[in-house]
């Protein structure tokens, strides 16, 4: 008995201990910086009347338990035993308690402190806590861009909306960053905007690779809170119409014995909504999970569109036949996708657009099942809710689908009846399954659909059984609630025979915080109502618990809220649903429910057709997604134990005995899903060949070998160009394999079109399709923010595009937060309109055919009158205004041809007008750019102005009369006078001009090294202006422009960065030591301006250390510049110069090592510098360095503070080589060196002579010398002399010769000007006098250094005028002359060493020759007829379009018969002769023939394949720039195709030039012309258009054509009255020559009748006469002519005048003696002789 009583006493004591009072502490498991922390404190099992008081706060257990927040008091009683507190987390407290210093375990402790814990519960301390994860994230950000996709080179406009945790506007400062497609940060900006809407823009570099860019925003003090938006960058042009491919069923059902129907609809509509009439070409293929595409042969089809629509069906037999060719069967299709491509050709304009369908899956079932919302824990004895979501195989919810559930239970009832229920409209089904008591496991087999159902299995287990029972949460209405609705939840305890707890306690959690807490008295069925407001959207957790016998029992449930509207209101309304016309105004009404800022933007919906489907505009779905990202819960709810339940919903919990472990990460653990990867083994020759190579690199090399070039090369020749040996073998093997396939294909083909078609199908397997479309007006507009108080009506004027605009609106309100409106669509359309296409440019007197297309979408036929409005400078039919009558049937389109001949070199506005009999009509105005004949030529002269030297106070600048100058061409001498003030070179006209110094170099900026010219000179200028505080002397916007230029340069250079921190001239190349060092040096100086990452610069420095050799020198595996010719007493100094260059970069790079964590790497860098200094010192001591190597070595040793003896040796060596003449000191070539390629430059013979312009290498060398002197001696006499020479080497626009010399000269001069800065006033007075058209004219310039303006002046003079200059004042200055004019012919002596040759061939002739060289005579374009690119062609077969689009820049379909666009083949050959070497890269700049554009696909092949022929290419208007690494001694030729976009006749020769990039004075320039006997050289015009074009042409008079009818003395009237000639000669024609767009006739004077300027004219002298090629005048060599006219402005090589023959010239053939002896002509001959005698003797008697 005693034992029994003892056991009963012990049990009672144990039970009483279980029922002891407890303090429960609840909190979100994550603490966010600056965001109030919601805390729940509950008093459990307290005695009646008990009161507990205390505080809650946060502390850092890793930092002496320092408090991280203020204390928050609480009071608990037995009646009010659950309180909800808000605990502030200020940034200042978090910082002071050391939270920011936590790195490995960012944990913080939530503590409840109360004496009750110690006094009543007898704990050792008065505290109880739980550990939380600390995160610095807070708030919400939404980033919006003005477009979803951009072209490289376009400007991106974006907005950032900043909101706090409550979705209200935040005014805290933001950090906005931009990442490029390779994940590199290219822009960082810290901003603060009181409106909470930050707006900015930036320019995407034009050399950017295609890919996805990202704009991210975060609070400056909470860097973990990061929200971003993505946008796509790709080369595109907007489509004119959109093609859609819509399958009848979004999936294809396939099983072992079944294949579902394959039916697809093709629809084509213009962007403004109207259907397209034309033809569709459709083809099919298979896609595996990796996206590998394999076409299904034989399924291609051609369809005619009716009302813009067509339909395609594939039968099982057709598909099986195509699969057999791939050795596949129908069951093999599961897991693959059916690729469908459609190309639609519009009938009226022949334009082509395409679409692809890549999401058409072969599936075993029509549906998919998602059971993720179903709990994984059951409550025995309570209903279990199965929540399933059924989707169609293509993704959307599937309504009204039967769902069958088979249930297997453990325990006494193993199986329950099958349950069947149909899905609701959202594709959801909710089934309550009654679970008997005692069930421990539930197995569910769920199937959706009756035929070929989707099946899913789920096993659910009960939590471990206990004496405290289970808590069941049941939803009577399981559907998702909406905002403003109430959710009812029933609570029930299960498994308790006798429940003793009085209350259920519950919490509602949403977005990572406890929204509310409460309790409900326990009943048989306890109901809790939760009102759903905006704070609970888009989902919330309901958590309930009770304590029984001291044990917590809990359960939870996630409730998804149906996504609806925003908390506030924003509605966009347009005035009606009517269509608008371009240029109309529209009224846009903005409706809100409170005062708000509304951000607007309108985007062309055509962009959605161009961009990826993943880049969508901001909408409320994205807003809810961001809001839900703060939700800390994982899964649908429930758990094995109370702590697990709390942890699963994102709660931290402690009751003193139990607690939840600290959360590890912010995100939920991801479920691992088994993914079956399926690939298709296609037994095709090409696939087999590719399959022979395992590595991706070898496969790429093989793919390149399979690709055919746009020029003739054998496989062996191609393989020899592949640099990597590992790539060379697969490349050669695959190239030879492809050639054998082509030969085999030719042998098996019957010939003609079929043969070409087969080749096309084989070739298209070798590369991905390039889809390019044509441009059509603006892409976005209406980018503005305005304040709206409930209603605002905005009148907007619509752009000229005919398209559908989508207007987006986002509002931000202080009371309602952010709201994204449903976009408003606005269609801009004209039922009748016309479309005009113009070439990029055309030359004067070329003939242009315009073909405006008239579109009629009315229901009636139209007769339209179409004309081109008269405009000066254009020859038009009837002088302009002469109309053509065109019949345009309803619903059709018609082209109308017009012929135009430009006669003036200018930009003219060409207006095409179409009028109908009713109010129907349209007009389009576009600018036609007309250029002069020949090529532009520029030359510069630089004079030093020194009023302190009496010899230099007056000087004369001679005029220029180049014999090569084009007659009637504009020619001028521009004169710029500057004082000796740095602001001229560095200011708003120099390095800080809108385009920077780089824009003045007249050089391209395509490679990595060239890109630095956007950055380095601007940094030098900014550094000078910051140091001398002179920004105020420049225009106010100059500082902003400098920041913009620096940001652009930084973004651009990041495109060349590799993952290891190194840089390459091209991303496809190996990294360059020299370029990497150059970037490190510049970016180290630009850290503050660009916001670059120091860690990235440290990576760059680390890479450079790996390039150092054992002796301390550096080597370059892929040099950008070859400096082995730069001079030196013996041999090459390249290694020395490179080592010094890297040392300089590393020294500057030490600025990036401020962080203590990088100290070890910093010491390695310093050790590397010391080692390199030792190497450089040894080379300097040997005394064998050339000037360039000596200068850079001296500067490097001085900069790094090397041992003084090494510095002295280097200094002395350098000064020995200096050349000093007058006040100038510089370093050029060393005359004793054998490796110099430039002869010494002499100083001017006298102070009034122009300064000779030195080559780029001399300027760079002298710049290093100046930097060395400034570091060693400061501003002294030597530095003054060097700087004086350097300043006078700058070009007219402020730059120097090339990139390196410009960068270094600007760097050196800015350092000099900082050292020599003075506030002393300087004056320079200059008087310039010259003879002008209206007599002698003088200009007086007074330049004062204290004036903001007036630092420089620019004047224009006639090219031939002599300019007298007088100088006064107390300051030196510079006078620069820029002469510019157009030339007939390229005469350049450098062509003796450097050569370029350009030939243009008709594409058919080229194809024949190419095929002959390939030993095959086919090509898919072989069916072209004749050699003339303008000749009629045979009809185009459908599949040729798919290959053809790769070769066309524009998406223009081939036309039939006379409408076929001509295509030509360009061949560009370069080589060098003699021993001349280049410093490195050479650039060929080819100006295309008028109307042509290069085929980008051809140019891409030259640069992107393994056998690379060109490093890079650029297209700029009519120019194609090709970058070559070097110029060989033998001819190196590359080829590409070009397509004529607009018909042009009488095409004039165009120019081409090749030059050494680093020494541009080494160049060769040539003209080239169109193919002989080509239509390009024929006349297009007719009638009065031709007469107008020839209006300026001379008329040739036949011998004695008027006979005796000379009573009016018409010869004498022409000579003396109108036009009154200035010369008269009787000449004999010696020869005829072609000069650019002119013909030159060399003649011998027989008799001088009259002269004005030509005082030296005499018998037997020669004179040249020029006439335009477009004129029909023809003078026969050997015959004599009487020629009279006006004096010319040009001279020949001997200085004698040459004359232009035009409409004011008299040309009469002299009669032969035989003709004059005839009786009929004897008198007429006498009259002619009398005129010659009288005019030569007496002249004009008036």
Curated annotation (Swiss-Prot):
This is Complement C4. Prior to secretion, the single-chain precursor is enzymatically cleaved by plasminogen (PLG) to yield non-identical chains alpha, beta and gamma. During activation of the complement systems, the alpha chain is cleaved into C4a and C4b by different proteases depending on the complement pathway: C4b stays linked to the beta and gamma chains, while C4a is released in the plasma. The alpha chain is cleaved by C1S to generate C4a and C4b following activation by the classical complement system. Residues 701-735 form the Anaphylatoxin-like domain. Pfam families: A2M, A2M_BRD, A2M_recep, ANATO, C4_MG1, CO4A-B_CUB_C, MG2, MG3. It comes from Cavia porcellus (Guinea pig). Disulfide bonds join 68-97, 634-668, 701-727, 702-734, 715-735, 1469-1533, 1581-1586, 1593-1671, 1616-1740, 1716-1725. The keyword Transferase does not apply. The keyword Disulfide bond applies. The gene is C4.
């Amino acid at each position: 008995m005693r034992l029994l009583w003892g056991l009963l006493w012990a049990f009672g004591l144990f039970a009483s201990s279980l029922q002891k009072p407890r303090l429960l502490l609840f909190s979100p498991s994550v603490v966010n910086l600056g965001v109030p922390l919601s805390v729940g404190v509950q008093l459990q099992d307290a005695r009646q009347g008990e009161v507990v008081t205390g505080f809650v706060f946060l502390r850092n257990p890793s930092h002496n338990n320092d408090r991280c927040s203020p204390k928050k008091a609480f009071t608990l009683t037995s009646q009010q035993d659950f309180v909800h507190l808000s605990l502030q987390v200020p940034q200042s407290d978090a910082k002071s308690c050391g939270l920011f210093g936590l790195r490995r375990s960012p944990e913080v402790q939530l503590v409840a402190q109360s004496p009750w814990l110690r006094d009543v519960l007898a704990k050792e301390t008065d505290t109880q806590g739980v550990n939380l994860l600390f995160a610095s994230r807070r708030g919400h950000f939404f980033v919006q861009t003005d477009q979803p996709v951009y072209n490289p080179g376009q400007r991106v406009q974006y907005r950032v909306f900043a909101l706090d945790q409550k979705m209200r506007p935040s005014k805290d400062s933001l950090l906005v960053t931009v990442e490029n497609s390779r994940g590199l940060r290219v822009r960082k900006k810290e901003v603060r905007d009181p409106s909470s809407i930050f707006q900015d823009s930036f320019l995407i570099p034009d050399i950017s690779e295609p890919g996805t860019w990202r704009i991210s925003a975060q609070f400056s003090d909470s860097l973990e809170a990061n929200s971003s938006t993505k946008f796509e960058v790709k080369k595109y042009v907007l489509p004119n119409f959109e093609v859609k491919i819509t399958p009848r069923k979004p999936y294809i059902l396939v099983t072992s014995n079944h294949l579902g129907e394959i039916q697809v609809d093709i629809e084509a509509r213009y962007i403004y909504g109207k259907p397209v009439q034309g033809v569709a070409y459709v083809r099919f293929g298979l896609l595996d999970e990796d996206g590998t595409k394999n076409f299904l042969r034989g399924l291609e089809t051609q369809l005619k569109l009716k009302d813009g629509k067509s339909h395609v069906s594939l039968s099982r037999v057709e598909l099986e036949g195509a699969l057999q060719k791939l050795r596949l069967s129908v069951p093999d299709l599961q897991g693959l996708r059916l690729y469908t491509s459609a190309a639609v050709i519009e009938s009226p304009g022949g334009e082509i657009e395409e679409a692809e369908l890549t999401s058409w899956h072969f599936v075993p079932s029509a549906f998919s099942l998602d059971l993720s919302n179903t709990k994984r824990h059951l409550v025995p004895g309570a209903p279990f809710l199965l929540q399933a979501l059924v989707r169609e195989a293509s993704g959307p919810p599937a309504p009204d689908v039967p769902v069958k559930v088979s249930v297997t239970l453990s325990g006494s009832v193993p199986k329950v009846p099958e349950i069947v229920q149909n899905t609701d409209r959202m594709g959801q089904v909710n089934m309550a399954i009654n679970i008997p008591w005692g069930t421990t496991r539930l197995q569910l087999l769920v199937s959706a659909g009756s035929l070929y159902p989707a099946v899913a299995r789920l096993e659910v287990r009960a939590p471990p059984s206990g004496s405290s029972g289970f808590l069941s949460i049941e939803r009577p209405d399981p559907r998702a609630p909406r905002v403003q609705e109430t959710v009812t939840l029933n609570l029930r305890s299960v498994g308790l025979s006798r429940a003793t707890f009085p209350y259920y306690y519950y919490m509602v959690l949403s977005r990572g915080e406890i929204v509310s807490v409460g309790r409900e008295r326990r009943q048989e069925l306890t109901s809790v109502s939760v009102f759903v407001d905006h704070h609970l959207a888009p989902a919330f957790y309901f958590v309930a618990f009770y304590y029984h016998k001291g044990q917590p029992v809990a359960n939870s449930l996630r409730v998804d809220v149906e996504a609806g509207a925003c908390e506030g209101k924003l509605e966009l309304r347009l005035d009606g649903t009517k269509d608008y016309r371009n240029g109309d105004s529209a009224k846009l009404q903005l409706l809100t429910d409170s005062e708000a800022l509304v951000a607007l933007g309108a985007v062309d919906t055509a962009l959605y057709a161009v961009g990826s489907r993943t880049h969508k505009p901001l909408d409320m779905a994205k807003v809810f997604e961001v809001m839900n990202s703060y939700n800390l819960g994982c899964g649908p709810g429930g758990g094995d134990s109370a702590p697990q339940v709390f942890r699963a919903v994102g709660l931290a919990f402690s009751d003193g005995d139990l607690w939840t472990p600290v959360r590890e990460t912010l995100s939920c653990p991801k479920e691992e899903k088994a993914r079956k990867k399926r690939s298709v083994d296609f037994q095709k020759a090409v696939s087999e060949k590719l399959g022979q190579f395992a590595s991706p690199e070898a496969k790429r090399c093989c793919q390149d070998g399979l690709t055919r070039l746009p020029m003739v090369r054998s496989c062996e020749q191609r393989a020899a160009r592949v640099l990597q040996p590992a790539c060379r073998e697969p490349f050669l093997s695959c190239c030879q394999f492809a050639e054998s396939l082509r030969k085999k294909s030719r042998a098996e083909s019957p010939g003609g079109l079929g043969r070409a078609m087969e080749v096309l199908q084989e070739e298209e397997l070798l590369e991905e399709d390039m889809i390019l479309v044509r441009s059509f007006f603006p892409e976005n507009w209406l980018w503005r923010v305005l304040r709206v108080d409930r209603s605002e009506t905005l009148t907007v004027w619509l752009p000229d595009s005919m398209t559908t605009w989508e207007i987006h609106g986002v509002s931000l309100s202080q009371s309602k937060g952010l709201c994204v409106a449903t976009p408003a669509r606005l269609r801009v359309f004209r039922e009748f309109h016309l479309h005009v296409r113009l070439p990029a440019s055309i030359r004067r007197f070329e003939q242009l055919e315009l073909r405006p297309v008239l579109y009629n979408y009315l229901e009636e036929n139209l007769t339209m009158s179409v004309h081109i409005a008269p405009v000066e400078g254009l020859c038009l039919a009837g002088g302009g205004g002469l109309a053509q009558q065109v019949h345009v049937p309803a619903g059709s389109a018609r082209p109308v041809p017009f012929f135009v001949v430009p006669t003036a070199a200018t930009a003219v506005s060409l207006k095409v007008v179409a009028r109908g009999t009713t109010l129907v009509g349209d007009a389009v105005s576009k600018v036609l750019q007309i250029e002069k004949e020949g090529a532009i030529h520029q030359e510069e002269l630089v004079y030093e102005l020194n009023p302190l030297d009496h010899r230099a106070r007056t000087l004369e600048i001679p005029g220029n009369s180049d014999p090569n100058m084009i007659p009637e061409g504009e020619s001028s001498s521009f004169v710029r006078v500057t004082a000796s003030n740095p602001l001229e070179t560095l200011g708003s006209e120099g390095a800080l001009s809108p385009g920077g110094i780089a824009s003045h170099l007249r050089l391209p900026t395509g490679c990595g090294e060239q890109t630095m010219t956007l950055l380095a000179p601007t940094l030098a200028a900014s550094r000078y202006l910051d140091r001398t505080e002179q920004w105020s002397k420049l225009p106010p916007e100059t500082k902003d422009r400098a920041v913009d230029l620096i940001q652009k340069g930084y973004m651009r250079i990041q495109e060349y960065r590799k993952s290891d921190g190194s840089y390459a001239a091209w991303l496809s190349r190996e990294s360059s030591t020299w370029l990497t060092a150059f970037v490190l040096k510049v970016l180290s100086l630009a850290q503050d301006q660009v916001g670059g990452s120091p860690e990235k610069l440290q990576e760059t420095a680390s890479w450079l250390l790996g390039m150092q050799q054992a002796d301390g020198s550096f080597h370059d595996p892929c040099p950008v510049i070859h400096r082995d010719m730069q001079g030196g007493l013996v041999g090459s100094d390249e290694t020395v110069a490179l080592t010094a260059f890297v040392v300089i970069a590393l020294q500057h790079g030490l600025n990036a090592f401020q962080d203590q964590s990088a100290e070890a790497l910093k010491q390695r860098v310093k050790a590397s510098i010391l080692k390199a200094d030792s190497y450089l010192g040894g080379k300097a001591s040997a005394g064998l360095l050339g000037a360039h190597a000596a200068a850079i070595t001296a500067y490097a040793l001085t900069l790094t503070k090397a041992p003084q003896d090494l510095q002295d040796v280097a200094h002395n060596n350098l000064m020995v080589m200096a050349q000093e003449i007058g006040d100038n000191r510089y370093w050029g070539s060393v005359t004793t060196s054998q490796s110099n390629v430039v002869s010494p430059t002499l100083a001017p013979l006298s102070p009034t002579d122009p300064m000779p312009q030195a080559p780029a290498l001399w300027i760079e060398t002298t710049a290093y010398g100046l930097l060395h002197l400034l570091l060693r001696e400061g501003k002294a006499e030597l530095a003054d002399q060097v700087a004086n020479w350097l300043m006078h080497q700058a070009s007219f626009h402020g730059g120097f010769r090339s990139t390196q010399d410009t960068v270094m000269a600007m760097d050196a001069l800015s350092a000099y000007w900082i050292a020599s800065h003075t506030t002393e006033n300087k004056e320079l007075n200059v008087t310039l006098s010259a003879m002008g058209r209206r007599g002698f004219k003088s200009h007086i310039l007074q330049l004062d250094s204290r004036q903001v303006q007036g630092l420089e002046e620019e004047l224009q003079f006639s090219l031939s005028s002599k300019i007298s200059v007088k100088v006064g004042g107390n300051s030196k200055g510079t006078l620069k002359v820029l002469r510019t004019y157009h030339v007939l012919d390229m005469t350049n002596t450098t062509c003796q060493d450097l050569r370029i040759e350009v030939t243009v061939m008709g594409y058919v002739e080229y194809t024949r020759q190419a095929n002959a060289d390939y030993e095959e005579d086919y090509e898919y374009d072989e069916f072209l007829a004749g050699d003339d690119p303008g000749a009629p062609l045979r009809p185009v077969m459908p599949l040729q379009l798919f290959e053809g689009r790769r070769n066309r820049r524009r998406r223009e379909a081939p036309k039939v018969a006379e409408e076929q666009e001509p295509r030509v083949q360009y061949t560009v050959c370069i080589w060098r002769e003699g021993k001349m070497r280049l410093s490195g890269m050479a650039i060929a700049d080819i100006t295309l023939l008028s109307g042509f554009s290069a085929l980008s696909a051809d140019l891409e092949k030259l640069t992107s394949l393994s056998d690379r022929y060109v490093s890079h290419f650029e297209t700029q208007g009519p120019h194609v720039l090709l970058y070559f690494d070097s110029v060989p001694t033998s001819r190196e030729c590359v080829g590409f195709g070009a397509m004529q976009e607009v018909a042009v006749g009488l095409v004039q020769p165009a120019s081409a030039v090749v030059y050494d990039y680093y020494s541009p004075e080494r160049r060769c320039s040539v003209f080239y012309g169109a193919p002989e006997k080509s239509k390009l050289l024929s006349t297009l015009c007719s009638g009065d258009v031709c007469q107008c074009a020839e209006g300026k042409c001379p008329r040739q008079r036949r011998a004695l054509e008027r006979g005796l009818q000379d009573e009016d003395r018409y010869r004498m009237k022409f000579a003396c009255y109108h036009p009154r000639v200035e010369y008269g000669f009787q000449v004999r024609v010696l020869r005829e020559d072609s000069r650019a767009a002119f013909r030159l006739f060399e003649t011998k004077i027989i008799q001088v009748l009259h002269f004005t300027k030509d005082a030296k004219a005499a018998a037997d002298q020669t004179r040249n006469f020029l006439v335009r090629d477009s004129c029909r005048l023809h003078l026969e060599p050997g015959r004599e002519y009487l020629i009279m006219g006006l004096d010319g402005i040009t001279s020949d090589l001997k200085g004698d005048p040459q004359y232009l023959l035009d409409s004011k010239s008299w040309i009469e053939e002299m009669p032969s003696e035989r003709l004059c002896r005839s009786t009929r002509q004897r008198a007429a001959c006498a009259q002619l002789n009398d005129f010659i005698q009288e005019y030569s003797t007496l002249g004009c008697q008036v």
